[in-house]
A protein has these predicted regions:
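Active-site-proximal beta-strand elements of phosphoester/diester hydrolases
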Residues: 1-10, 119-129, 171, 238-244
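Short hydrophobic patches on amphipathic alpha-helices
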Residues: 26, 57, 211-212
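Extended active-site neighborhood of metal-dependent phosphoesterases/phosphodiesterases
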Residues: 51-163, 259-264
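Binuclear metal-dependent phosphoesterase catalytic core
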Residues: 107-112, 116, 122, 207-214, ...
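Active-site environment of divalent metal-dependent phosphoester hydrolases
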Residues: 9-11, 42-45, 66-77, 130-133, ...
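His/acidic metal-ligating clusters that form di-metal
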Residues: 30-32, 121-123, 136-229
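N-terminal active-site segment of His-dependent metallophosphoesterases
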Residues: 1-52
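Divalent metal-coordination and catalytic microenvironments
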Residues: 5, 22, 34, 39, ...
Length: 294
């Protein structure tokens, strides 16, 4: 399950609906894993607000991981400090690769039912904050060393699987530029809601190209754009937004909820949908079957 953009502010009544929805959706779906793709907090005190969200998930005794968004370290604590707080929770799976840009680059492996092999690989990545390139404004991007980290690990999993790529999925906060290319492609099939333009970085650092080169990524799941929850199938990869999870501490025009991703062990397909208030499920789709034009 993916939560995104909780934008929690501790002791702010506008965040109450976000915390309620997290609890409600967890009760309904009972997921095996939760990944929160950034912008978890949106005000001070940072530690209390951060602990409130992670503690809520942890209390369900569900393993969880996080990736950072561009607003998380704007509330008086650094990514490293927030990472250390996350590490204090019993059910936290978040780690970070040493020597790689960011503080939430890690891999989660999903084992086969008989526990003999890796059935799926989840790449969780820090999409960073804002551009650090001179004269280039806007949002940050996945850096070259992060892309190389992904490529090298992908090669290892493929090699261990007899030269066949293992079905893999990527989770991070800021959408890559290909989200814009995909919705402009009239041949690409889309499901869900698109109410704002893609707020991607101005520079394309090549993450999608690396994914195509490795041949393992089946789906990408991001947040950042609160009024989008669509999924579009482009060049054999599903580019999907999570559903905005937050309350009214920041702009939003969609009722809040979560995205659910259900994997199949054989890797031929996966199913995804949005879960809302009272367990309502919408936009259920099987990928790739429901995204192929007749």
């Amino acid at each position: 399950m993916q939560f995104t953009d909780v934008h929690n502010i501790y002791s702010d009544s506008r965040s109450k609906v976000a915390l309620q929805r997290i609890k409600e959706v967890l009760n309904v779906e009972k997921p095996d894993l939760v990944i929160i793709t950034g912008d978890i907090i949106y005000g001070k005190p940072a530690e209390e607000g951060f602990r409130e969200v992670l503690g809520l998930v942890s209390d369900f005794q569900i393993p969880f991981g996080i990736t950072f968004g561009n607003h998380d370290d704007e509330q008086g604590m650094t990514r490293k400090q927030l990472f250390d707080i996350a590490s204090s929770f019993e059910y936290n799976l978040t780690t970070t690769a040493e020597g790689v840009s960011g503080f939430s680059n890690y891999i989660l492996t999903v084992r086969s039912n008989d526990n003999t092999k890796d059935a799926a690989i989840l790449y969780c990545m820090d999409s960073n904050t804002y551009s650090t390139i001179k004269n280039i404004e806007g949002y940050g991007f996945i850096n070259f060393d992060q892309i190389e980290w992904y490529r090298e690990n992908s090669k290892k999993f493929t090699s261990a699987n007899g030269g066949n790529p293992v079905q893999s999925f990527a989770f991070f906060h800021i959408p890559i530029p290909e989200y814009s290319y995909a919705v402009e492609d009239q041949n690409a099939v889309m499901t869900g809601t698109r109410m704002e333009q893609v707020c991607a970085p101005k520079l394309n650092s090549g993450m999608f190209a690396a994914m195509k080169e490795m041949g393992d990524i089946k789906g990408i799941f991001v947040g950042h754009d609160h009024d989008n929850d669509y999924a579009v199938y482009w060049n054999n990869i599903l580019l999907a937004y999570g559903r905005y999870t937050g309350g009214n501490t920041v702009y939003n025009h969609l009722s809040n909820g979560a995205r659910v991703i259900e994997l199949s062990e054989d890797g031929t397909s996966f199913t995804t949908w949005i879960t809302l208030e009272k367990g309502e499920r919408i936009n259920k789709a099987v990928c790739p079957d429901d995204f192929i034009k007749d």
